[in-house]
Regions:
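Double-stranded beta-helix
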Residues: 2-6, 78, 82-119
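A short glycine-rich, His/Asp/Glu-containing loop-to-beta-strand
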Residues: 1-36, 41
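Glycine- and acidic-residue-biased ligand/ion/polar-headgroup-sensing regions
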Residues: 40-53
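Short acidic-glycine-tyrosine-enriched beta hairpin
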Residues: 57-76
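Short hydrophobic/aromatic-rich beta-strand segments that constitute the beta-sheet cores
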Residues: 34, 54-56, 89
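Structural motif
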Residues: 51-53, 68, 76, 84-86
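Short, surface-exposed secondary-structure edge patches
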Residues: 24, 44, 59-61
């Protein structure tokens, strides 16, 4: 398992192959992901534990444990952890296909090499 530290928590990469990627996302309460979209990456996210507020284009939705949602390209999206949050993400394998429109930590688009250094 590869662990990728993020400013908002961490990603645990359980599987990455030519067909799909499976990650566990752990987002700390009060933290949020970047406002982003993808050109090609399609992802379905399942809430394992906690409460998330999710922006999908221009609509905010609340998801709790047992809920899931799918993000199709080029949907603009962001997740906010209302509580400590554990998510499972299954996606197509284009893991570096991230266009950040806004980020609390001024991270650029795509892969952030420093987040992967100790993985």
């Amino acid at each position: 398992m590869k662990i990728v530290e993020k400013p908002w928590g961490r990603e645990e990469w359980l599987e990455l192959n030519d067909n799909y990627c499976f990650k566990r996302l752990i987002i700390n309460a009060g933290q949020r992901t970047s406002l982003q979209y993808h050109h090609h990456k399609l992802e379905t996210i399942y809430v394992v534990e906690g409460t998330a507020e999710v922006l999908l284009d221009d609509e905010w939705k609340t998801f709790v444990a047992g809920d899931y949602f799918t993000v199709t390209p080029p949907t603009v999206h962001r997740m906010v952890a209302k509580t400590d949050l554990i998510l499972h993400e299954v996606s197509t394998p284009q893991v570096d296909d991230v266009i950040r429109l806004a980020d609390d930590h001024a991270r650029p688009d795509g892969r952030i090499d420093t987040e992967h250094e100790n993985a």
